[in-house]
């Protein structure tokens, strides 16, 4: 009987301790700090919630991102915007892109992941326009075995290439 009572008390505790936590991939909104108990969609930014444990990538400001490019010439730059946004042919403002960046639209990343396999041992620096797609792409890279993934918070829309020598050196304005 004592064993039964002990089991009744311990089972709920072990079940509770295994409960997954879900979060919105960092998008620079207040919802970045909210933790949910089940999968779904963020009510604020409408991004798909991900397991909190999957967010094992580093987030850097634009200035820190540029410094990382300077200090790590072997890093791979991954622009996850559309081809039109990347090359400046889109109908809306496209801002520009980092020199030597690889462009794979986040919508195509899952099926094109194999193109990046040769870079698994290198640091991958991921960016987009407003830091909405790049956190999603960063999480996908981590889920696919990439261990050194860095996301640029804010996106290229926050860049003023005239204000920083590093950005003038590495960023192409459309």
Question: Model-derived features: where do they sit?
Answer:
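Hydrophobic alpha-helical transmembrane segments of integral membrane proteins
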Residues: 8-9
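Positively charged n-region of N-terminal signal peptides that target proteins for export
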Residues: 1-4
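Rhodanese-like catalytic fold shared by cysteine-dependent sulfurtransferases
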Residues: 19-63, 68-71, 84-123, 133-174
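Short hydrophobic beta-strand that contains or immediately precedes a catalytic carboxylate
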Residues: 76-81
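N-terminal signal peptide c-region/cleavage motif recognized by signal peptidases
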Residues: 12-14
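Short, surface-exposed ligand- or partner-binding patches at beta-edge/loop junctions that are enriched
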Residues: 127
